[in-house]
Amino acid sequence: MEFRFNCHPLFRQRIVRINNSLLPTGFVAQHRREALDATAQISEIINFVGQLSAQAQGLSNPVTTSQKLRNSDHHIYLMFESNQKHGLVVGILKVGRKSLYVFDQNGETVNVTAPCVLDFYVHESRQRGGLGRELFDHMLKEENIHPEEMAIDRPSEKLLGFLQKHYGLYKKIPQMNNFVVYEGFFANKHHASDIDGRRMHITASPNTNLFGPTFTTVGEQRRSSSQTRQQVVSPPVVQQPPVGRYAAKRPSCSMAQIIHNSPTTVSTEPNR
């Protein structure tokens, strides 16, 4: 994919990483105008390649745009080929962390903040040449992660075949959302500490038939169990006898005696 401007100054290396600043890694602007021009050019590249990726996947709207990237903590890897003209952008890979509700191997719902593959595209003229593997390997090295530890957002059949061919990923854990998770996902050292505290359970409440199931975390269940144990072992409350004027005997209530048909010692005639 060639552009109307020279891409060589933007790509100081073959694969660059871009965050919400819309400036590639290794790029140093000498003045403000140069930085603004660079962000405008990177935005044009991202929007164009993102549109091509959406068309290749049969999507009506692109997953990757410069505006979405600017308003998120995700980042994009762009692959570049140098030539005698303006250079070529040949691939894009978008990744980022997202909060997901997924099923583990036991079928329990778990809330994790997981690294995800959000978009992946190599131009048709450069496919089957090893560029996709090179781009994906570069991302794994930069993110310090293994492929099975990532959730894949709405992968195409071509991407699923790519992951199986190059990384041996084929054992999927069935999910109810658009993400694909492979065995080994929950061994991820990046979010394993979040899993135990966010493992979800369905309560067996009488209100389930009326309001639907209620999900509680392991932490909430532990606190509830702890409170129950404290209530069981708490000592009985001993009521202290009243003292002073509060210990004086109160007169009987004639109205209560009349209601309950009890004899009363109070005269029915008023004192005159």
UniProtKB/Swiss-Prot annotation:
As for family, the record states: Belongs to the acetyltransferase ATAT1 family.
Query: Source species, please?
Result: Aedes aegypti (Yellowfever mosquito)
Q: What name appears for this protein in its UniProt entry? A: Alpha-tubulin N-acetyltransferase
**Listed Low complexity bias regions:** 224-244
In the Enzyme Commission scheme, what number(s) does this protein have? 2.3.1.108
Its domain of life?
Eukaryota
Q: Which PANTHER family match?
A: ALPHA-TUBULIN N-ACETYLTRANSFERASE 1
GO terms for MF: tubulin N-acetyltransferase activity
Keywords assigned by UniProt, alphabetized:
Acyltransferase, Transferase
Q: Which residues are listed under the site Crucial for catalytic activity?
A: Q57
